[in-house]
Amino acid sequence: MAQFYYKRNVNAPYRDRIPLRIVRAESELSPSEKAYLNAVEKGDYASVKKSLEEAEIYFKININCIDPLGRTALLIAIENENLELIELLLSFNVYVGDALLHAIRKEVVGAVELLLNHKKPSGEKQVPPILLDKQFSEFTPDITPIILAAHTNNYEIIKLLVQKGVSVPRPHEVRCNCVECVSSSDVDSLRHSRSRLNIYKALASPSLIALSSEDPFLTAFQLSWELQELSKVENEFKSEYEELSRQCKQFAKDLLDQTRSSRELEIILNYRDDNSLLEEQSGNDLARLKLAIKYRQKEFVAQPNCQQLLASRWYDEFPGWRRRHWAVKMVTCFIVGLLFPVFSVCYLIAPKSPLGLFIRKPFIKFICHTASYLTFLFLLLLASQHIDRSDLNRQGPPPTIVEWMILPWVLGFIWGEIKQMWDGGLQDYIHDWWNLMDFVMNSLYLATISLKIVAFVKYSALNPRESWDMWHPTLVAEALFAIANIFSSLRLISLFTANSHLGPLQISLGRMLLDILKFLFIYCLVLLAFANGLNQLYFYYEETKGLSCKGIRCEKQNNAFSTLFETLQSLFWSIFGLINLYVTNVKAQHEFTEFVGATMFGTYNVISLVVLLNMLIAMMNNSYQLIADHADIEWKFARTKLWMSYFEEGGTLPTPFNVIPSPKSLWYLIKWIWTHLCKKKMRRKPESFGTIGRRAADNLRRHHQYQEVMRNLVKRYVAAMIRDAKTEEGLTEENFKELKQDISSFRFEVLGLLRGSKLSTVQSAQGTKESSNSADSDEKSDNEGSSKDKKKNFSLFDLTTLIHPRSAAIAAERHTISNGSALVVQEPPREKQRKVNFVTDIRHFGLFHRRSKQHAAAEQNANQIFSVSEGVARQQAEGPLERSIQLESRTLASRGDLNIPGLSEQCILVDHRERNTDSLGVQVSKRVCSFKSEKVVVEDTVPIIPKEKKHAKEEDSSADYDANLTDTITHEDYVTTRL
């Protein structure tokens, strides 16, 4: 940095200057190249084409040159979305490079299509790489067109690329140890991780999934789950993977939003993709919904259409349940709950009876199971009151009547958990926290029953309870039974999920438990650290003599830090303020030890109370807020899991009736034993081809129905996505840039048309001049002096005012009546027509300058009127007719100049005068000429010039007005100027 500082001298300014220069200078563009790129930027098609054509001949410019921003002409045209220039540049084989990627990023569909259809030059037409300017690439090598298009989520571009047969590389697992992954990670680990992330971004594109996947729902489910697992492994890109996972979940939900009928919804939710065509499938088991719950697709499950279908199945027997009064609902549930033993017995005896089928309904099954569990809790309450207990000092007491009644419920719970684990698998069983709680509760009840049996068999004497051993089986059984009662009561919280008010609260409580576990990990570390230090300090001061009570639970607390276990207890209870400060004192006069111990104890309280406890409160508040923000989705997902557990075929009977073997269960058991254990195994009867064919046809029909529904859903989703994108886009800066580019291109197109029109007009005038010299020689000789005084400056509008007939086909058949007499104008011979060149400009018809204030009245008639306008001549089709009109007008003008009678019968001048006091007046005159059956109205706008300024105006004549082509003829009060 020393080079930035200079020694200040006497003549130096107040503040020194640091010289600046471009250290990474690039090659300068030539003026021709700058003009070429500027023309591309402005959209000047003609100039760009001219530059490209000159470059092919003279090689003056490099058509692949780049501007200071590193853009070629093709990239500039792509940014401006000028498809005409893009097509022009590609026709001249400019260097393409990353143009396709730029077009995809800008989402210019037309440019992408042009680039995809463009064939690269080969052989001599191909530009050598050494002649190309090195363009800095904005894209990494792993970014392919399909990956970039998927990142932009542009459906049209993705469709164009997929039609070309592109492919996406399959990403490897994070822990993949193949040679490719290991070598790529060793060479550049960052690029390896970024490449995987870019691939997953492309695969998670909703448009790509909708376009290329046969089963978009399954693809979205699996991809979101995989991305969620990746976020746990690659913590560096955790937020990106979680966002992609949410994107896939939202896509599945939005796609399900497009369903319009219950039939479509049932086809989607009942579709099973893991069975072959020859296997028997159940068409009403909500297989796709179960898969969504397995992959934790909360948005999909909580979608209103899905919830409506589930609710209709849940309240199958009560269609108007939600509209009933709350009192009616409570009475109905109470009656069904009281009758659950009757329904259970009916199902055991006759499963197909009306009452047996009634209990199989999901809602009735839920009420019966809830009533059974409430009965179990009532029995636990009776057992805790010891109503039938007579002798409390018996070491091995026999079971009471209430305990005998509790035993069937405990056995029923255990049997239900075994069946659930058998049907769903161990992995699915342990993923549910309520199942873990049930496992702990059932284990405690089994341990209690076992210890009571041991105590009943081993101990039968009557001894005072104070004399029993600490680890007596009866005492341990009572402790375990008390803990099991707590778990049993808390298990009732799981039923709150069915209620819309208590459900979100129960979910928030479950989320807070996770925060408490995280907090306990840090707290236990702090607790163990301070407990070790305090125990090391006070270990030597333990008091044992003369104490009837030892520990912190005594009336006078002592030996709080004598052992490690006692120290842990003391520090834990100090959080609640139950430990006194004097426990840090010692009998010896060791004040330093007391000071250090009190300081350590105070520091622990500050850390645990002020820091950790407030941190726990903040974490729990954050968890509750997360649930509150998505309370509806979280609650509906939890309720759906509860409902689905009752939609299953098994587990119909509530506890304890599920322990009783039903006739159906006995028949299944005997059949299984006969099939698997008997020596003579029954050979399976082969199925007929007709049965297999019908099954395959049914499965194929379901598959075709599903694909048809998916096709309709994808079409609706794409249409809605494009519509929403247009709605949300609004007016942005890009729109103004596009509008500016369109205006600039239109400006250059108009200028090109005007140049071509002016050139053709001049050439036509020069050709007409030679043919009209003989007819106009008399007019020029008689009025040579007056024509010099009447020269004016005409604008481009005045010189390009054209006459267009509105009906040329009818003009030849009609006659025009003027001044009360009809005059038929005959067409000139065809030989003369071929020699005469039709003039499209008004200069060949004459400009009239008013001399007097007299007004001439023009008679109105119903014949057709010609219109005067500015533009490109349309008279090529009506050429012969207009040539005749031109020749007749010249003849009539000559007759008027020579005072030939009848001129007034041919032309009527209608004058309109408009004056302005602040500026020069403008005189508008109309000449109405009668030719055949057409009326021609010519409007001339001529500035009125005073006589004293005529000579000055003669010197300032415009360059656009050619004096050699004009002459003036004076007739009565008017001056006719001939061009």
From Swiss-Prot:
GO BP terms: calcium ion transmembrane transport; regulation of cytosolic calcium ion concentration
Catalysed reactions listed for this entry: Ca(2+)(in) = Ca(2+)(out); Na(+)(in) = Na(+)(out); Li(+)(in) = Li(+)(out); Cs(+)(in) = Cs(+)(out)
Q: Which residues lie on this side of the membrane: Extracellular?
A: 384-403, 454-475, 535-599
Spans annotated as Disordered? 762-790
User: Gene3D superfamilies, from UniProt?
Assistant: Ankyrin repeat-containing domain
Intramembrane stretches (start-end): 325-359
**Which chain positions lie within coiled-coil regions?**
223-260
Report activity regulation. Answer: May be operated by a phosphatidylinositol second messenger system activated by receptor tyrosine kinases or G-protein coupled receptors. May be activated by intracellular calcium store depletion.
Q: Where are the ANK repeats?
A: 29-60, 71-93, 96-118, 141-165
Q: Which InterPro entries match?
A: Ankyrin_rpt (IPR002110), Ankyrin_rpt-contain_sf (IPR036770), Ion_trans_dom (IPR005821), TRP_dom (IPR013555), TRPC4_channel (IPR005460), TRPC_channel (IPR002153)
Where is there biased composition of kind Polar residues? 762-775
From start to end residue, where is composition biased (Basic and acidic residues)?
777-788
* GO terms of molecular function: inositol 1,4,5 trisphosphate binding; store-operated calcium channel activity
| An example Gene Ontology CC term for this record | cation channel complex
Residue ranges spanning the membrane: these are 363-383, 404-418, 433-453, 476-498, 512-534, 600-620
**Segments on the Cytoplasmic side according to the record's topology features:** 1-324, 360-362, 419-432, 499-511, 621-979
Topology class, membrane: Multi-pass membrane protein
Q: Where does Zn(2+) bind?
A: H172, C176, C178, C181
What does the sequence similarity comment in the record state about its family?
Belongs to the transient receptor (TC 1.A.4) family. STrpC subfamily. TRPC4 sub-subfamily.
Reported function: Forms a receptor-activated non-selective calcium permeant cation channel. Acts as a cell-cell contact-dependent endothelial calcium entry channel. Forms a homomeric ion channel or a heteromeric ion channel with TRPC1; the heteromeric ion channel has reduced calcium permeability compared to the homomeric channel. Also permeable to monovalent ions including sodium, lithium and cesium ions.
Please report the name of this protein according to its UniProt entry.
Answer: Short transient receptor potential channel 4
Protein species of origin: Bos taurus (Bovine)
Which gene carries the instructions for this protein? TRPC4
